[in-house]
């Protein structure tokens, strides 16, 4: 895993690949190779601008997307609402979670989108940071929400480019412990300050910050995750 990739090659798995391959492996215990690509991180315990430097070795230099496995919080495991507040702001869900489908039209996960706001709720200021959270499902029912694993991905591609959202099944992945992908719709900060953008393939810019509200994220079942 240490060799350099040729220019133009990136670790950019699709939603189906995150849910049916990477998240499944993590739910089965994970391994060092997978964690070098998608590390385990409580994305809500750090600021969005820190995420690029905490990403896996194949995403660390990426200016568009970062993916993490996010452990389930104790309060969430007890049936409570997870804390999405950081020192400088909070993550706010936008829209409703949606199913993610496999190529043969089966629901394989759930996708939920969040946008980062600076300040305190409900008067925070929306930024271009976007997070897509995916959870895997064990059945083909769209209403089924996975119990253990999720992943989050952060992307900073321009909102226009990210507007073409993909639908994921209930067993989605969030680049974080839950396969979670963070995205930042602003493109103006793609330069040396790429760290300020979310893992999603969007760039963070004030001019397109309003477009982030249309994103949504799915969740995985935490009971099935092995975080050791």
Swiss-Prot record:
Residues 80-89 have a biased composition (Low complexity). It holds the Pfam family NAM. Keywords: DNA-binding, Nucleus, Transcription, Transcription regulation. Residues 77-96, 166-197 are annotated as: Disordered. It is found in: Nucleus. Residues 5-156 form the NAC domain. Residues 168-193 have a biased composition (Polar residues). GO terms for cellular component: nucleus. Gene3D superfamilies: NAC domain (2.170.150.80). One of its GO terms (molecular function) is DNA binding. GO terms for biological process: regulation of DNA-templated transcription. The NAC domain includes a DNA-binding domain and a dimerization domain. This is Putative NAC domain-containing protein 61.
């Amino acid at each position: 895993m240490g060799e350099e990739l040729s220019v133009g090659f990136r670790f950019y798995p699709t939603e189906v690949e995150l849910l049916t391959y990477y998240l499944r492996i993590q739910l089965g215990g994970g391994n060092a190779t997978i964690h070098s690509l998608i590390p385990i991180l409580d994305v809500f315990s750090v600021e969005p601008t820190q995420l690029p430097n905490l990403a896996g070795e194949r995403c660390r230099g990426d200016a568009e997307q970062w993916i993490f496995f996010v452990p389930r919080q104790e309060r969430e495991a007890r049936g409570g609402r997870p804390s999405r507040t950081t020192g400088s702001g909070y993550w706010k869900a936008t829209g409703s979670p949606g199913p993610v489908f496999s190529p043969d039209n089966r629901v394989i996960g759930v996708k939920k989108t969040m946008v980062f706001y600076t300040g305190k709720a409900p008067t925070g200021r929306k930024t271009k940071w976007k997070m897509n959270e995916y959870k895997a499902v064990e059945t083909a029912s769209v209403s089924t929400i996975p119990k253990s694993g999720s992943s989050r991905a952060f992307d900073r591609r321009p909102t226009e480019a990210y507007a073409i959202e993909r639908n994921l099944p209930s067993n989605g992945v969030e680049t974080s412990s839950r396969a979670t992908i963070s995205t930042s719709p602003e493109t103006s900060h793609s330069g040396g300050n790429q760290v300020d953008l979310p893992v999603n393939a969007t760039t963070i810019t004030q001019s397109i910050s309003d477009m982030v509200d249309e994103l949504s994220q799915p969740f995985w079942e935490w009971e099935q995750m092995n975080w050791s």
